[in-house]
């Protein structure tokens, strides 16, 4: 049997009404109708394959294919993050940098890093895990006293993308808030960074419900392994080639390489015309 060409659904219906099939032909025709109906149901109107559901996202990722000193593409756009009050960069087009540090423990570098920030008059944000407040209260107080933001990096550093219950999510943040209050005597700023960048869209919604701004990053490098620290030259090349307008820079407070290069990094960026702002200056 020679099968007719199938066009739009209306044409298919008209064709079927005029079609007088034999037994086998009827079976084939029914199969075609079913397959067409399924395709119409699952394909979006533009004919393109649908993207994976946002709830499936579990790791923050960046694509630097746009080239040197260009804002990388996040696996969730800043426009989409705006819906949840979250950021990975400042897309206003100004020559500004937001410097942030993550830490779960102290490795003897925080004092040197704070000294450089004080000397260069650069504001920063420190996203700390619960253990840091318990073991380094003096350093936490110094961060706050010198004008830096201390943000919430959770209490136990879990994979937050696996936490769907709001009460469990809240517990991870509230326990850190309590530790901050005990150490500083004040309320914790409402900035949150997911451990290891693991998250789901529901996590963004949960953080927003709790009054938090979720802060990802647009520039980082492999600096977290204390047994495999990058060389000074590698670190400077990697960071300088990828710095861009509105960058939110993530460095690890435990990195001896970061402590070594920070002053050179900051002065170099200042020479390029960059200014440094606190996270409170981020605007949607």
Tell me the role of every PLM-derived stretch.
Residues 243-280:
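Catalytic grooves of carbohydrate-active enzymes
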Residues 94-97, 107-109, 118-250:
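Metal-dependent polysaccharide deacetylase catalytic core of the NodB/CE4 family, i.e.
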Residues 101-103, 253-254:
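Short acidic donor-binding/metal-coordinating loop in glycosyltransferase active sites
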Residues 2-100, 106-114, 119, 265-268, ...:
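N-terminal pre-catalytic segment of deacetylase/amide-hydrolase enzymes
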């Amino acid at each position: 049997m020679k099968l007719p060409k199938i066009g739009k659904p209306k044409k298919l219906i008209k064709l079927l009404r005029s079609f007088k099939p034999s037994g086998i032909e009827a079976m084939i025709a029914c199969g075609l109708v079913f397959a067409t109906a399924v395709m119409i149901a699952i394909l979006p109107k533009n004919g393109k394959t649908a993207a994976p559901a946002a709830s499936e996202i579990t790791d923050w990722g960046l694509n630097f294919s746009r080239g040197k000193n260009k804002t990388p593409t996040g696996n969730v756009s800043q426009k989409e993050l705006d819906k949840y009050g979250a950021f990975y960069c400042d897309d206003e087009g100004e020559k500004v940098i937001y410097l942030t540090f993550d830490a779960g423990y102290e490795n003897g570098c925080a004092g040197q890093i704070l000294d450089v920030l004080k000397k260069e008059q650069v504001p920063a944000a420190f996203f700390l895990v619960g253990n840091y407040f318990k073991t380094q209260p003096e350093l936490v107080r110094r961060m706050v006293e010198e004008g830096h933001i201390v943000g919430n990096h959770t209490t136990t550093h879990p994979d937050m993308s696996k936490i769907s219950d709001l009460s469990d999510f809240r517990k991870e943040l509230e326990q850190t808030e309590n530790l901050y209050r005990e150490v500083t005597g004040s309320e914790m700023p409402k900035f949150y960074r997911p451990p290891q960048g693991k998250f789901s869209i529901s996590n963004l919604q949960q953080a927003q419900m709790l009054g938090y701004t979720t802060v990802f990053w647009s520039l980082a490098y492999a600096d977290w392994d204390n047994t495999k620290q990058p060389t000074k030259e590698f670190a400077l090349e990697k960071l300088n080639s990828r710095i861009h307008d509105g960058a939110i820079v993530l460095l690890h407070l435990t990195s001896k390489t970061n402590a070594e290069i920070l002053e050179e990094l900051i002065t170099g960026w200042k020479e390029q015309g960059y200014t440094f702002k606190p996270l409170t200056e981020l605007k949607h």
